[in-house]
């Protein structure tokens, strides 16, 4: 039966193919040429819609998402810029306050320094007074001990020696006086006898001599003997020793002289110390006060503006790059899609011949024609199996995983991952600039510390100059007199030694005691005086004062330590809030934006991954079902399986019944439709060779069906184009038989 216009009432979407026939009364359907005027889309019409292929659309959607992400990132960076500028302004104000701290702290530090100097000078005065008095009394005590000890030894030696000498002289004088008188008397008696005899002799001689007119004098020794009798040692023989004994020195003059001379320099030093340090007050106006500092580092070429401007330029550049790349990719995607459409069109034309042949499974033919690539992939994978049942299951699993809905889910997930990748690349480009901001923030801290160090160093230099001048003044006015007094004391000791030596020289000069006394003096006093002089010389060389100077980092040490690399706690930085774990507030703003975008990318990646996992789950469902049926033998009718599908038999005219009434039209109101008409019949084309003829059905065949035999299924004819098999020679034969 031919199609008629009344067929439109049965299936409104079915075209009136018989209307195209040259003679409507003929009983054959005229096939329309594919390149002519057809109700379906031709190649040119298909190619006109290549630009809206799925990959171009997905790439454009990715581009839109990347542009939205770039715009969102730019908006977030603008917000971060405002927050960073606000934080930078706060840091700038705090840095200016920190840099101005020397101005405020110097007043208190100056007062502390001045008070410390005054207290030190007051303590120095007390120490000097006590030291001078102690040294004065100590020197006098030592000298007094020395010369009094020497005086005791001297008196002992001299007086003992004089007393012994005077006693010896007196005894010797008394002995000599008594002995000489007795000797004189004895000599006088002897001389008188001799003189009488001698005079008598002389008288005889004179008698003779008178004859010659001469005379001999007589001997008279009485006067000499009287003199000898009256001879005695003079009483003045021990007057010198008595005088020496009575004239031993007591060194009272030396004592008075020494005390007068020694006390004079000490008293002068005390007087000068009292005059110089009596009411010493440090002049606080001499200490400097640094000026206030105003730091500006938030603006300018190295400020926050330049950083965020560079980030904005980077985002804009990245957006342009993504626009260019994705648009070019979307455009280039049209080329393979156009080639794919051309191949699909050719494949559809080739495989459309299957519709004109008798196919055992027309749905398979429709699937192969409508989904050429997925069907080809299934056939390619199924060709690796020799069992027809497994070939069917493999094709079914691939078809299940490549339905338009499943592929839409897969493409959506892949597009989401591609979008996340583009956003990640953009984020990585922005993250590379964060260390630059950290470096700039570190430079901000360095600027504050440098300003503090400069102010602190300038203040310390000026203050140290004042302290040095004060130390020099004290050394000249106070310790200068100490040096003078030590020199004078050394001179006094020399004078003491000279004076003592003079006294000894006047007393014992030219005597036997002079040398021993001088040796004792040098041993007992001279060596001690030399030791004292050495000590005074050391005091003279080291008597000066040096007040400790102020370090150059008085005001900057703490700030410099807080940003140093040795700081274990980043929150110690003076640019960080209390409790912050980041190094400062400025980089925290940018890091927060980066973390926000990163969280968004992570969320989108998870969503895209879940979408892909949904497709994987769908594919696994098909794979699991196919694997389950892989090892299950198909049950025949006798085992509870389904009935055998009868082949449509061609009648004598070559027509086949097409049950068009089996297709329900849910969009049409049943009341508006006319009653169903008999199903039309297709007329076989005279130019087409039927690939498969009707199989005569014997009674035995019907009996086999009743008994449950599956019978043969001619799947091979459904996959042949122009008599050639589309698969291997082992295509679909028997379920339970391997190919031969």
From Swiss-Prot:
Membrane topology note: Multi-pass membrane protein
List where in the cell it is found. Answer: Cell membrane
Could you confirm whether the keyword GTP-binding appears in this record? no
Stretches of the chain found on the membrane's Cytoplasmic side: 76-137, 342-397, 625-740
- Predominant subcellular localization, coarse grouping: membrane
Q: Which residues lie on this side of the membrane: Extracellular?
A: 1-54, 159-320, 419-603
- Tell me the GO BP annotations in alphabetical order: plasma membrane fusion involved in cytogamy
Q: Which UniProt keywords apply?
A: Cell membrane, Conjugation, Glycoprotein, Membrane, Transmembrane, Transmembrane helix
Q: Which PANTHER family match?
A: PLASMA MEMBRANE FUSION PROTEIN PRM1 (PTHR31030:SF1)
Briefly, what is this protein's role?
Involved in cell fusion during mating by stabilizing the plasma membrane fusion event.
Instruction: Indicate the family of this protein.
Output: Belongs to the PRM1 family.
Protein's recorded name? Plasma membrane fusion protein prm1
Please name the source species: Aspergillus fumigatus (strain ATCC MYA-4609 / CBS 101355 / FGSC A1100 / Af293) (Neosartorya fumigata)
Q: Taxonomic lineage per UniProt? A: Eukaryota, Fungi, Dikarya, Ascomycota, Pezizomycotina
């Amino acid at each position: 039966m031919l199609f008629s216009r009344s067929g439109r009432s049965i299936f409104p979407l079915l075209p009136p193919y018989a209307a195209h026939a040259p003679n409507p009364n003929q009983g054959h359907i005229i096939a329309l040429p594919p390149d002519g005027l057809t109700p379906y889309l031709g190649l040119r019409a298909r190619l006109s819609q290549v630009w809206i292929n799925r990959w171009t659309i997905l790439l454009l959607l990715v581009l839109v998402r990347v542009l939205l992400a770039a715009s969102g990132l730019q908006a977030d960076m603008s917000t971060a810029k405002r927050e960073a500028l606000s934080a930078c302004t706060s840091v700038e104000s705090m840095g200016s306050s920190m840099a101005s701290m020397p101005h405020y702290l110097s007043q208190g530090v100056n007062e502390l320094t001045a008070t410390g100097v005054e207290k030190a000078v007051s303590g120095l005065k007390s120490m000097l007074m006590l030291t001078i008095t102690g040294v004065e009394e100590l020197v006098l005590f030592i000298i007094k001990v020395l010369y009094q000890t020497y005086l005791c030894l001297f008196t002992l030696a001299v007086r003992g020696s004089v007393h012994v000498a005077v006693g010896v002289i007196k005894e010797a004088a008394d002995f000599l006086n008594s002995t000489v008188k007795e000797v004189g008397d004895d000599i006088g008696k002897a001389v008188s006898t001799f003189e009488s005899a001698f005079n008598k002799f002389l008288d005889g001689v004179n008698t003779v001599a008178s004859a010659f007119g001469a005379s001999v004098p007589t001997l008279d020794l009485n006067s000499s003997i009287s003199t000898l009798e009256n001879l005695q040692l003079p009483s003045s023989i021990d007057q010198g020793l008595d005088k020496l004994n009575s004239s031993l020195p007591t060194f009272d003059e030396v004592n008075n002289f020494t005390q007068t001379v020694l006390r004079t320099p000490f008293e002068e030093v005390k007087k000068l110390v009292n005059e110089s340090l009596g009411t010493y007050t440090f002049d606080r106006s001499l200490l400097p006060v640094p000026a206030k500092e105003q730091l500006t580092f938030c603006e300018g070429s190295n400020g926050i503006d330049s950083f965020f401007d560079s980030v904005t330029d980077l985002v804009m550049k990245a957006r342009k790059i993504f626009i260019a790349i994705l648009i070019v990719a979307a455009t280039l995607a049209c080329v393979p899609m156009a080639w794919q459409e051309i191949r699909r069109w050719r494949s559809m034309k080739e495989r459309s011949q299957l519709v004109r042949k008798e196919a055992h499974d027309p749905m398979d033919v429709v699937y192969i024609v409508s989904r050429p690539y997925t069907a080809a992939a299934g056939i390619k994978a199924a060709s690796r199996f020799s069992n027809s049942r497994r070939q069917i299951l493999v094709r079914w699993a691939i078809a299940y995983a490549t339905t338009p809905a499943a592929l839409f889910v897969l493409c959506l997930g892949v597009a989401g991952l591609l979008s996340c990748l583009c956003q990640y690349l953009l984020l990585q480009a922005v993250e590379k600039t964060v260390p630059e901001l950290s470096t700039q923030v570190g430079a901000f801290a360095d600027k504050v510390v440098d300003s503090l160090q400069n102010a602190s160093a300038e203040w310390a230099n000026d203050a140290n100059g004042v302290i040095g001048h004060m130390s020099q003044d004290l050394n000249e006015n106070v310790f200068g007199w100490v040096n003078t007094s030590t020199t004078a004391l050394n001179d006094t000791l020399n004078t003491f030694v000279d004076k003592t030596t003079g006294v000894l020289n006047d007393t014992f000069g030219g005597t036997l005691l002079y040398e021993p006394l001088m040796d004792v003096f040098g041993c007992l006093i001279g060596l001690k005086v030399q030791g004292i002089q050495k000590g005074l010389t050391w005091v003279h060389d080291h008597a000066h004062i040096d007040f400790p100077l102020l370090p150059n980092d008085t005001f900057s040490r703490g700030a410099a330590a807080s940003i140093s690399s040795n700081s274990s706690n980043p929150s110690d930085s003076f640019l960080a809030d209390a409790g912050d774990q980041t190094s400062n507030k400025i980089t925290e703003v940018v890091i927060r934006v980066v973390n926000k975008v990163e969280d968004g990318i992570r969320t989108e990646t998870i969503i895209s991954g879940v979408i892909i996992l949904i497709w994987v789950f769908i594919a696994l469902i098909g794979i699991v079902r196919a694997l389950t049926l892989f090892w299950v033998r198909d049950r025949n009718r006798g085992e509870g399986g389904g009935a055998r599908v009868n082949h449509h038999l061609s009648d004598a005219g070559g027509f086949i019944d097409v049950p068009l009434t089996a297709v329900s039209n849910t969009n049409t109101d049943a009341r508006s439709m006319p009653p169903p008409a008999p199903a039309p019949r297709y007329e076989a084309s005279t130019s087409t060779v039927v690939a498969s003829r009707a199989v005569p059905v014997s009674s035995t065949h019907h009996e086999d069906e009743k008994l449950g035999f599956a019978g043969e299924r001619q799947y091979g004819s459904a996959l042949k184009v122009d008599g050639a098999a589309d698969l291997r020679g082992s295509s679909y034969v028997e379920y339970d038989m391997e190919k031969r």
